[in-house]
């Protein structure tokens, strides 16, 4: 599977799981050259942030790695990291709020749905904090 297929599959999996479009892509340094050629010379060392599918691209050192996430979740993980930086990973609970409605005379109340938690490694948190 090439980088484009892997990116599409990972993005699709994230959207199916969390029902929102991600706005961060963590990608490994080892996949940098493939990603660079795909988008026409992406340079991670320039001062300006880089985007793909309206998501901020952040390079990590973990080899062969692609992960989609949301800024708000990483920021929650950073708060946990600042409280206790001894752990290797930080799990963030995710929820989705629904909007209530009235349909055919039936009232459907709004609710909060618990989604699968997302976990961030110490490396992801530290590099995110440096690059944003």
Task: Annotate each PLM feature.
Residues 1-5, 11:
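Exposed extracellular interaction/assembly regions and N-terminal maturation sites
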Residues 10-11, 43:
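Residue-level detector of functional hotspots within protein domains
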Residues 16-101, 107-132:
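Extended oligomerization regions of viral-like shell subunits
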